[in-house]
Amino acid sequence: NAFAMANGCIRVYSGLMDMMTDNEVEAVIGHEMGHVALGHVKKGMQVALGTNAVRVAAASAGGIVGSLSQSQLGDLGEKLVNSQFSQRQEAEADDYSYDLLRQRGISPAGLATSFEKLAKLEEGRQSSMFDDHPASAERAQHIRDRMSADGIK
């Protein structure tokens, strides 16, 4: 739908605007702004490089540790670390967007409904601990819970 780049540039796919309301697009852009403001792209690159460096160091150690680090088990471990880090960043960017929308006097409902639309597209898909994004239905519920706590319908 959209993504943030390390240089602070945000890209939005035109298809997003066709399927979402203006309020939902505002929420998605706020989410991507969160990634930029919170330094997620750069931190993500650092984590990816760090996990790869650990894996290379383990491989150079040789023996069982070296063999495991070069196996599919090593691939899974690296992917798990990166995906869990990414899921945490997604949740932080969701909260950033929610707070930004509120500060600007814009309804955060578009954030919840954008996730609900994405959840419909994800129906039947099995989620995994290796996913780099939390499930959209869970993200929508988190926003709905925040709205309820803040007295927003």
Model-derived features: positions:
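A Zn2+-metalloprotease active-site environment signal
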Residues: N1-K153
